[in-house]
Amino acid sequence: MSNQKKRNFQIEAFKHRVVVDPKYADKTWQILERAIHQIYNQDASGLSFEELYRNAYNMVLHKFGEKLYTGFIATMTSHLKEKSKLIEAAQGGSFLEELNKKWNEHNKALEMIRDILMYMDRTYIESTKKTHVHPMGLNLWRDNVVHFTKIHTRLLNTLLDLVQKERIGEVIDRGLMRNVIKMFMDLGESVYQEDFEKPFLDASSEFYKVESQEFIESCDCGDYLKKSEKRLTEEIERVAHYLDAKSEEKITSVVEKEMIANHMQRLVHMENSGLVNMLLNDKYEDLGRMYNLFRRVTNGLVTVRDVMTSHLREMGKQLVTDPEKSKDPVEFVQRLLDERDKYDKIINTAFGNDKTFQNALNSSFEYFINLNARSPEFISLFVDDKLRKGLKGITDVDVEVILDKVMMLFRYLQEKDVFEKYYKQHLAKRLLSGKTVSDDAERSLIVKLKTECGYQFTSKLEGMFTDMKTSEDTMRGFYGSHPELSEGPTLIVQVLTTGSWPTQPAVPCNLPAEVSVLCEKFRSYYLGTHTGRRLSWQTNMGTADIKAIFGKGQKHELNVSTFQMCVLMLFNNSDRLSYKEIEQATEIPAADLKRCLQSLACVKGKNVIKKEPMSKDIGEEDLFVVNDKFTSKFYKVKIGTVVAQKETEPEKQETRQRVEEDRKPQIEAAIVRIMKSRKILDHNNIIAEVTKQLQPRFLANPTEIKKRIESLIERDFLERDSTDRKLYRYLA
């Protein structure tokens, strides 16, 4: 079969042409034209759309697509010109209604016509790249109605007038507005933008420019912001009701520019109502409104932040440099915490916990807290007050809150080592006097300090707690080996490691014989059980509980310092003693003795002895007797030593000197670490790196760094470069 010849088939063309009636196109078009008229005249109920579709189909099939297309355009144009005259003739409020009515009729007619001309749409128009029926119908409406001279301007003015009326409080037909403006959108984005949106935005800009000027002259800041917020809300609602969604960003930008951006500086600085007034008076609602409005404009929040920062720094500067407000350290710190709480609440409540404002708050507090050189001391005194008495009766959760607030202030300190120095002194007094209200709170704060600054910062503080525990064990051993002492006075000794505790010179004091004997027995016991140790008594740091019987047999237990005990025990053998006799018998230094006597004789309710003559100050000619008339409703009476809560100027200078001495080895260690790593480094870079490395503890003075470099050169840790004197080399 494969060998058979292939047969070729040929299809011949028709020998006779198909003849089309020369008047076919005109006749068919006339049928379609009449149908279009009937559709526009809303008289289409008797039409056969199947027949009309077939007629249009055949015209295209017989190459009369162009005639059909141009005829459709001409007929629709004619109808629209007539409709535009009817719309133009409408008066007053009926103008938009007539326009909307004719627009709806046109759309309905256009849908029917498009269905009839569907074949032309799919073939002829597609192949010739002409505009399809439906968009052409929209274009014709645009050109013959919307852009008709006598309608165009009137339409725009009517719409803008209605928007204006709505803005001043009149009620308008939003449904009609929505339909008419949707017409613009249906006609194309460019039509909506050019014929309505752009003029609308221009008119809105002018409206809000005038209104904002009226408001700024007549309203305070809070009211102005309320009106601005209301206008923004209204414009957003307006978009939702009858504008294109894309217009929201544009119209809100207009309101933001005219109402907020153009008046930012005047608003924040408005006298008696601006930002500072809001901050001072905790106007959270107004502050929140300002934040939400200003965040919408360029540099809005920067403006708010800068004004807040300026106010905070000025307020804080006054707070920490006012001598009156620095008299009480506890109140001083509490004011700082109150201000911090106040602005934390403002930032959380009104500013959405914005990190920009948190950072501004932190930088401001760091700035002004360090303006007062006594801030480290005062913060430590605040802690001391809380841990002595201020935490009684509050929950563990509240204790942690207070300690966290203290740590927050601590982080702001540039001289954390100064705080450490004071904190160690105050902790020592609390531990030795047994006056801390909570060991857990003490240890919790040390853990927080350790987390913040590292082990080195807290190692000595932890050593103090270790000594207290070791001392308890030592005392049990002492009394266990001396059972005969159980009947006499009880001695409790805390053995303190010199390196862990604040060093104080031993103050001379003649202890009463009963106590002195016990002390010697303890010394013998301790040195006998520990080799290579040395004990020195710190009597100025001790306390005593002594029982006293006054004139009419009143019995009290007096909690006193060791010095006060030494003075009071003298009155067991004498009814009357002079200042000189007490001084000679006790050998207590004059300044300490005067404070001691002042506490015993001059404090109301604690005056267990009387002085002659009566006065608040202690003189060297004074005489002292037991106050037989002393009474107290308490059996146990604590007699504190009259002492300034904060350091005196000489004490402050002494502490500062100790701090500076302690810094020297730390600076040298930092220099050596850096040079060991870098080998060669110039002077400026050493200063910068040492400052950065020591910043967590203190702000190193460049002059002191230079001195430490010189000291290290003298001791052959470093050497200067022979050619460049500002270059240093590390010597291994």
From Swiss-Prot:
The protein's matches in PANTHER family, at most eight in alphabetical order, are given as:
CULLIN
Which GO terms label this protein's molecular function in UniProt? Answer: ubiquitin protein ligase binding
Q: Which Pfam families match?
A: Cullin, Cullin_Nedd8
| Keyword line | Isopeptide bond, Ubl conjugation, Ubl conjugation pathway
Give the position(s) of the covalent cross-link described as Glycyl lysine isopeptide (Lys-Gly) (interchain with G-Cter in NEDD8): K676
Question: What does the entry report about post-translational modification of this chain?
Answer: Neddylated. Deneddylated via its interaction with the COP9 signalosome (CSN) complex.
What is the organism of origin for this protein?
Arabidopsis thaliana
Protein name per UniProt: Cullin-3A
Q: Where is the Cullin neddylation domain?
A: 662-724
Protein role: Component of the cullin-RING ubiquitin ligases (CRL), or CUL3-RBX1-BTB protein E3 ligase complexes which mediate the ubiquitination and subsequent proteasomal degradation of target proteins. The functional specificity of the CRL complex depends on the BTB domain-containing protein as the substrate recognition component. Involved in embryo pattern formation and endosperm development. Required for the normal division and organization of the root stem cells and columella root cap cells. Regulates primary root growth by an unknown pathway, but in an ethylene-dependent manner.
Question: Which family does the similarity line name?
Answer: Belongs to the cullin family.
Its assembly, as annotated, is:
Interacts with CSN2 and RBX1A. Interacts with BTB/POZ domain-containing proteins BPM1, BPM2, BPM3, BPM6, BT1, BT2, BT3, BT5, AT1G01640, AT1G21780 and AT5G48510. Interacts with SR1IP1. Interacts with NPR3 and NPR4. Binds to NPR1; this interaction requires NPR3 and NPR4.
Outcome of gene disruption: No visible phenotype under normal growth condition. Reduced sensitivity of the inhibition of hypocotyl growth in far-red light. Cul3a and cul3b double mutant is embryonic lethal.
Gene Ontology biological-process entries:
positive regulation of flower development; response to red or far red light; ubiquitin-dependent protein catabolic process
